[in-house]
Amino acid sequence: MAFKKSLVFAALLLAGCDDTLTLNQVCSETPGFCEDLNKDSHCKDERALLIYARYHEYKSPTDENKYDLLQNLESYNRCVSRAAKIEHIKLKEKTTSRVEGHLTALKEMTRIYNETKGSNHPGLLYYHWSRNSDSTAMNKLLNMQDDPRVQNDPEIQLFLAEFYAKVDDDKTVDILYRVLELNKRGHTPNPEVYSSLVSIFYKHEKYKHAYTFARVAQLSGVEDIDIIPVTNQLASMGKDLANLDSLAQRTYESIQAGEFVSPRDF
């Protein structure tokens, strides 16, 4: 339910300054942005967000709007491609419209990729590298690491962490700490931040670090963190977990308050 509420809120933001803009108005003004998507109730929220994103990219085809559209296309496509596999026994046209929506998403993603090949937008650069194996795009992004658009964007920082995770664990940890520093009050970081930190620390036998962030992950509601191996390691070393539990609680609270500071000498 919380996810759906966030989607609706995002849709309102996409509507921009004109808070009277409704989905029906968009579809009436630009029916082509609605008619080539699925017609049934599947992926309702993703479909609505995509329609708004298409409209705003059409009205103002900036790199930022193209990036937003690309993200919404991928989100919608993930949903509708799954839904397209659900066969309607009585209503074959529903399955057909889902396939149409899937094909529309693929076509539009190809268009955005082609139109943004020369872009310097950090998000688009990462997409070109991760989706199309464009090493030139990734090199551009790596050369922009001191750019405020990169340094102050938690999503882009997480992209960089995913890249460095393959080649440099120390750099990856620094970037993941930066993601936590950028976390806004009341927000919960992407669970991948915690799972990556736990994995790296465990690999390097920094068990206290691994345990602390595994507990932070649990406090944040992350369910797929396996804390048992690191707990067993610490128990075999005779370590008292109470102090680490307290540290984890303080760390969690600082992250949730938007006040986390990278523990350089952790």
Model-predicted segments: where are they?
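C-terminal motif of bacterial Sec signal peptides marking the signal peptidase cleavage site
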Residues: 13-16
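N-terminal Sec/ER secretory leader and immediately downstream segment
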Residues: 20-122
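Alpha-helical adaptor scaffolds
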Residues: 122-202
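Boundary/linker segments of alpha-helical solenoid repeat arrays
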Residues: 152-156, 184-193, 218-231, 259-263
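TPR/TPR-like (Sel1-like) alpha-helical repeat modules
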Residues: 205-223, 248-256
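Terminal, low-structured helical/coil segments at or just beyond the last alpha-helical repeat
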Residues: 226-266
